[in-house]
Amino acid sequence: MTTADGIVRGRRVGDMLAWRGIPFAAPPVGPLRLRAPQPTEPWTGIRDAGDFGAAAPQHPRGVTLRPGKRQPMSEDCLTLNVLTPAAPSAAPRPVMVFVHGGAFVMGTTALGIYHGNRLARRGDVVYVSVNYRLGPLGFLDFTEFSTPERTFDSNLGLRDQVAALRWVQRNIAAFGGDPDNVTLFGESAGATSVTTLMATPAARGLFARAIAESSAPVLVNDGHRARRWAREFMPLLGCDDPAEAARALDAAAPVELGRAGNRLGARVLAETPGLHPFGPVVDGEFLPEDPLTSFRAGRAHPVPMIIGTNAREGTLFPRMLDALPTDAARIDTMFGLTDPEAQARVVGAYAGYPDPAAAIDLGGDITFWKPSVEIAEAHSMHAPTYNYRFDYAPRLMHWAGLGATHAFEMFAVFGYGDSAAGRALTAPGGRRGLRAVTDRVQENWISFARGGVPAPWWPRYDVDHRRTLIFDVPTRVERDPGRDRRIAWTGYAGYRDEGSAAESLP
């Protein structure tokens, strides 16, 4: 296959054609570390594109793909993957570009659930998945440490995603895709990227519609907070002199940056539960304003959007990366500037609070559900918007106290219930239900990607009716699910409000 940068050779995977590890930007190493992505150098000859590219540097133990198999890590990580049905198509295929999650500190497109075969096959679409920089190398803002000799840029991981979308515009037609029919979709940090890119001027025109699965806009940091965290990071790296910061950032090995980042993340979670030092930054340039502000003002890109969350987002986090305020002590700290009466209204909406289950649901709601509803409210006034809640969970997940937890909808989106992991989850019961929900989810995602509207039985969202699709057995439409909680959150003022009451749409 011939791209703008050279010829790539992929491989056949059953009835699909796959090209993996294609560079979409120059390796961000040496003088390009902590700089905006630069164009890749064209190559001569044929470049092998049979294997996934390296994962971005992240946890020192690496990325486990399956028992005994780890994905290599490297700063040279700016690659993407293209998957398309092998059968010829009379017309260009719709394109679905996926941004993986992982709290902006972990993840890789090499994970099996992200391969996309089942989704691309059923939808007859071109599927693209994107690696981007993570952690300190991708989502801390070191710009104030720039010197005349050494410049640092902001929002590096977000800029990587824009560079990948530009690559798609230049090259996807060669793979049979339609550059004018691109759906950008992501989960968790990937969904946060999607909603942030909708407020990013550089991303305008690079995608025609968007799907945000469990977006967490709280991960977007204002410039003041981002600069403070960058300053706190440097002593953790062993550099106490700001004048030496540029040299220290250049000299540090990725593992040293990662360890300092882990320590910073733990400190921030302890001091300000619910916030996270790694994420997009409102820098006034690449990201001019907070995405929620853009949506409320009608300045977000007016593309059709599907947005939603899972019924019990918070239950996963105490068992792994416990980055949410999921216990009463951290929730009290999180409320920060909130009036005590407003706080009482919120906690009163969670039956049993401060019991752990209620606290976990509250933490999940403030991180994912509440801001996603606010985005749906605002965007519905300017563009077609479809809101969902994913409620289905097999028996084993209910037994484990997880329910429809964070990220589980991806088993339906990617048809992963037929994988070994999916079969294990549904062994005690629920395989038929997961297949039914998978059919409904994929039907809607594919219809939306192909023509900009989901299935006809999914009504548009608006603030008058708040009709929301509930993915469950059976799948159904409900009006204003979670109404009592939504109203209770009115008046919440957290850290990012800096002393003013939070805006709330009716």
Segments from the language model and where they lie:
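Short, solvent-exposed loop/turn elements at domain surfaces
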Residues: 27-33, 314-317, 396-397, 478-479
